[in-house]
Amino acid sequence: MMMQCLDGLKHLALILLTCCDADPPKVRQNPKDVARGTVFTVNEIEALYELFKSISKNGLIDKEQFQLVLFKMNTTRSLFADRVFDLFDTKNTGILDFEAFARSLSVFHPNAKFEDKIEFSFKLYDLNQQGYIKRQEVKQMVVRTLAESGMNLSDHVIESIIDKTFEEADTKLDGKIDKEEWRSLVLRHPSLLQNMSLQHLKDVTKTFPNFVFHTIVTDTPSELDG
């Protein structure tokens, strides 16, 4: 699902760019400033902004737009998409500006730090934001993910999967998985983060070749700036 999101992103952007007459609002943030908070280069940030303008309303996007663009879903709500959106909607307004949009994509960039991916994936599963993952939270994510992908497993099989997960991860035997235990589990099984990388984000300026860049910079990773 994650591997296909940029194709949907590009497709929707091209449609909207050809059918929308209104000029979107100018970006308030300096591209260099936005880039510093991400793994994107300044040129990539400008490409992303052109994309953002094509899908936003008044410089903002809501959860439905976010889900449609990133996950190619419209009628079926995705718990994963909801969680990603909510974690970047820090003010609980139900909308994201461009900077939050860029940061939400940055964590899925293949060049994002592995530790950042571990931390973010932990937050995705910590549905109640209690600082640990409970069995019911894991089951909720597994059940919803399977349903969204069209897979049907018996409750017995699902419970067995969760049992094995906790047997390995819950080393403190307290019925929950904390950040330390989650990190250890992921380090043993890196494939748990396979959905945390979007390969096409490495070539965002090539994916959207029609977008015009205005900032003249040396195209080096933004984290090296300033």
UniProtKB/Swiss-Prot annotation:
Taxonomic superkingdom: Eukaryota
Pfam families in alphabetical order: EF-hand_7 (PF13499)
CDD domains: EFh
Residues the record marks as site: Involved in dimerization: S149
Record keywords, A-Z: Lipoprotein, Membrane, Repeat, Vacuole
Family affiliation: Belongs to the calcineurin regulatory subunit family.
Protein name (database record): Calcineurin B-like protein 6
Subunit composition and interactions: Homodimer.
Gene Ontology biological process terms from the UniProt entry: calcium-mediated signaling
Organism field: Arabidopsis thaliana (Mouse-ear cress)
Residues annotated as domain EF-hand: 20-75, 76-111, 113-148, 157-192
InterPro entries found in the cross-reference section: CNBL1-10, EF-hand-dom_pair, EF_hand_dom
Entry's localization field: Vacuole membrane
Keyword Transferase appears in the UniProt entry: no
Function recorded in the entry: Acts as a calcium sensor. CBL proteins interact with CIPK serine-threonine protein kinases. Binding of a CBL protein to the regulatory NAF domain of a CIPK protein lead to the activation of the kinase in a calcium-dependent manner.
GO molecular function terms noted in the UniProt entry: calcium ion binding; kinase binding
A single cellular component GO annotation: cytosol
Post-translational modification: S-acylated by PAT10.
Membrane topology: Lipid-anchor
